[in-house]
């Protein structure tokens, strides 16, 4: 999936992002604003994970968005 589609629908997807990564606050989600690199950094900080792991989790989220048709 093209990340631009997620970024463009960020407001609608924030709830799904929050379900996936519950440690992210509303302020952080607003700051991320769909920017993938910012999400990577926030996941690293909030969960104490390496960049590679954050990237892996985001790819899984992208696949879930496409599979469950959260983004058209």
What residue spans do the PLM features occupy?
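Intrinsically disordered, low-complexity, hydrophilic segments
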Residues: 1-72
